[in-house]
Amino acid sequence: MAKRRKSSRTKAKETNWQERVIQIRRVSKVVKGGKKLSFRAIVVVGNENGQVGVGVGKAGDVIGAVRKGVADGKKQLIDVSLTKASSITHITRGVSGGAKVIVRPAAPGTGVIAGGAVRTVLELAGVKNILAKQLGSSNPLNNARAVINALEGLRTFSEVAQERGVPLEHLYT
């Protein structure tokens, strides 16, 4: 009976998640007997419907590292407010370490114009039309976290309308 309950819980949580590995790196730790090798995986998890997260996993084998990265990414999910044109609501910037990212909304039909880890994060968030530029560091982990930082700073149309004291319909025109 416990098995049946557990499987129904996992089915309810699993809602069409996609995962993409950005980087797998072999890392080593110096111990008394020599070097201990392990793998670090950077994974982006998203549902292409406004939720995305970046996770890092370390393990003795690649599959274990990816599995841990996916679990970590699901713990760090954020919600992204998208427009009707599958873009973001306004221009925003994100920083993580030495990586800086500028993200701008784009007209329908533009596509995702971004590179590397930034592109992967935006695609799995469900953004279809966007312009993004990486500045500073080219480190995939810092760039992925910088995009997440930028997307966390987004405000919805209703928040902007409330701050300005303007009806929501006036923002669309």
Curated annotation (Swiss-Prot):
Entry's Gene Ontology cellular component terms: small ribosomal subunit
Gene Ontology biological process: translation
Keyword presence, Nucleotide-binding: no
InterPro entries: Ribosomal_Su5_D2-typ_SF, Ribosomal_uS5, Ribosomal_uS5_bac-type, Ribosomal_uS5_C, Ribosomal_uS5_N, Ribosomal_uS5_N_CS, Ribsml_uS5_D2-typ_fold_subgr
Pfam families in UniProt: Ribosomal_S5, Ribosomal_S5_C
Record GO terms (molecular function): rRNA binding; structural constituent of ribosome
Keywords, ordered alphabetically: Ribonucleoprotein, Ribosomal protein, RNA-binding, rRNA-binding
Annotated S5 DRBM domain residues: 17-80
Function: With S4 and S12 plays an important role in translational accuracy.
Family annotation (PANTHER family): MITOCHONDRIAL RIBOSOMAL PROTEIN S5
UniProt domain comment: The N-terminal domain interacts with the head of the 30S subunit; the C-terminal domain interacts with the body and contacts protein S4. The interaction surface between S4 and S5 is involved in control of translational fidelity.
Subunit structure, interactors included: Part of the 30S ribosomal subunit. Contacts proteins S4 and S8.
NCBIfam families according to UniProt: rpsE_bact (TIGR01021)
Family (UniProt): Belongs to the universal ribosomal protein uS5 family.
UniProt protein name: Small ribosomal subunit protein uS5
Lineage: Bacteria, Bacillati, Cyanobacteriota, Cyanophyceae, Oscillatoriophycideae
